[in-house]
């Protein structure tokens, strides 16, 4: 589900200004999705002939049941706004992190970073929400298949070009991946992985 104009313009601008400022801490990671041989065997990641993974920078807001960032308060209201937008509530935050991919003008058009799922759990109650902090190139590819399908190959469902203020909401066991920007200097997203409660309030 694509959600346009997810938050007010002033909130969008604040997030972009803070997260792209010199004061915001980013941490280098050599892969977009760390994996082992076991992850390949279980289907947590999926590699194909078009996989060319690039480094990225991370900022973890929340993990292992606790906030891990002084900036957690900046993004926490987005969870409540998401609940209002989709008419669902969330009982648990699995992980919230930001990813920054920097420009790579040599990156081939049809390539992509590692295809992965956001949680290895087969529990359907886990949901992912990707929020685009800035407008850029570097599409997000979302596939039709889930880890439960145990696919031999994947088919693309949607290609989503990052647009500031827009979000994508989908099941956390759906395969997806990013691509680095080739024309813009940076591509910044916030990735929420949340556990949905059984009953909604619509």
Language model regions located:
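Non-heme Fe(II)/2-oxoglutarate
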Residues: 1-90
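Catalytic core of non-heme Fe(II) oxygenases with the double-stranded beta-helix
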Residues: 68-190, 194-202
């Amino acid at each position: 589900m694509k959600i346009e104009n997810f938050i007010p313009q002033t909130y969008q601008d604040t997030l972009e200004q803070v997260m792209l400022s010199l004061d915001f801490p980013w941490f280098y990671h050599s892969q977009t999705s760390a994996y082992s041989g076991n992850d390949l065997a279980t289907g947590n990641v999926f590699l194909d002939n078009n996989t060319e993974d690039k480094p990225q920078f991370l900022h973890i807001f929340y993990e292992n049941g606790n906030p891990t960032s002084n900036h957690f308060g900046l993004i926490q209201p987005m969870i409540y706004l998401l609940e209002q937008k989709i008419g669902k509530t969330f009982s648990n935050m699995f992980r919230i992190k930001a990813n920054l991919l920097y420009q790579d003008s040599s990156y081939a058009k049809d390539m992509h970073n590692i295809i992965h799922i956001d949680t290895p759990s087969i529990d359907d109650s886990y949901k992912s929400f990707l929020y685009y902090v800035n407008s850029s190139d570097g599409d997000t590819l979302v596939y039709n298949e889930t880890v439960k399908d145990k696919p031999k190959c994947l088919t693309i469902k949607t290609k989503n070009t990052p647009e500031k203020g827009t979000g994508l909401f989908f099941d956390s066991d759906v395969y997806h991946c990013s691509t680095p920007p080739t024309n813009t200097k940076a591509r910044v997203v916030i990735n929420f992985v949340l556990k949905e409660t059984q009953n909604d309030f619509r």
